[in-house]
Amino acid sequence: MKKRVVSLGLAAMMAMSMTACGGSGNAGTSESAAEDAQGAEGADGEVFKIGGIGPITGAAGAYGEAVKNGTELAINEINEAGGINGYQVAFNFQDDENDPEKAINAYNTLKDWNMQMLLGTVTSKPCIAVVAETTADNLFQLTPSGSAVESISGDNSFRVCYSDPDQGRASAQYIGEHKLATKIAIIYDSSSEYSDGIRESFVAEAPNQGLEVVASEAFTSDNNTDFSVQLDKAKESGADLVFLPIYYQEASVILKQANDKDFHPQFFGCDGMDGILSVDGFDKSLAEGLMLLTPFSVDEESSQDFVTAYRDAYGIDPLQFAADAYDGVYAIKAAAEKAEITPDMSTSDICDALKTAMTEIQIDGLTGTEMHWTAEGEPQKAPKAVEIKDGKYEMMQ
């Protein structure tokens, strides 16, 4: 009973904040509780059908699981509160294993299900592949976390998270404005659009912030277990901060190997770092003082209703990716209500209505207040940073 009260309270809070113009889950394919709550999926034209695509299995599985859970939580709340424009919402999530080809297969599966809107994909490479399909089909797409520039290349596509260039630029600005360091070493994944895109914009902005990049060392996804060379060069360069625009799995290895080398600079990452405290066998003390740019923290006061509801539903703390997805669902709801769409409309007509409405809404969400979107699909919201202290995230000023 407690979970239901918290869930409905959060739904009411989020519903009031919307303004238009003024358990862990199973791996693999998921037809979620958002559908089960209706007793039946519903015939086409009677319910809105939102699809999701992302990794549930594989190295990036934590991200996809978080997005699936955050989406389900929001949709269940919306359905309990009466749906969107009086219609219930069905949700179907497909596992892409962080693979572009499998993401296309997942997209085709969702098309066969008669998906009308896509909240996905979760990671950049699959998102770049899928956005070409949604653009050709004129199907509305909102990615919660696809941060590569090309992830929203069509006029039908938007994102909740910051783009890679925005993250790199904002990271350099934050480090410079808060005088965290002057000499920067970068360790990045040159095989990842996410990592290399952030690095590129960071390097471009660094001189404007009085920062000197003294080392820039690459690795690839095929060689991501031994970082001795990269760490030695960073240490020899005299860097007082190491910027890690990478995912948390590699970051956890880097922190351990840096400690083994008695190398203790300030470490700073981006949203892909979220999840490092959940790595199996990782000594959380090695992350003490780690900073990362992220618009969401489980310890932030304004997030507590969501965090409680998420813990009650899934038994774990939400990652930022869950918050991105949750905000994405409520953004779709706000745009759908602004556009007054109904599920009996064609997918193309729904897309045309939503892509106009997305530029006219403003929402207060978990990842930002007064969030709004440009016609290019980019979110407008203020960046935040957190620091890990005593095994927990703390918001920084």
Regions found by a protein language model. Give the residues of each.
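Short, low-complexity disordered leader/linker segments with a strong preference
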Residues: 1-49, 80, 397
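Beta-alpha junction/loop-to-helix N-cap segments that form part of ligand/metal-binding clefts
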Residues: 27, 62-69, 81-151, 219-222, ...
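Extracytoplasmic "Venus flytrap"
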Residues: 42-44, 48-72, 94-100, 122-123, ...
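Hydrophobic alpha-helical segments within soluble ligand-binding/sensing domains
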Residues: 103, 160-183, 196-198, 224-228, ...
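Extracellular/periplasmic bilobed ligand-binding domains
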Residues: 200-293
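Extracellular/periplasmic periplasmic-binding protein-like sensory domains
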Residues: 255-326, 387, 393-395
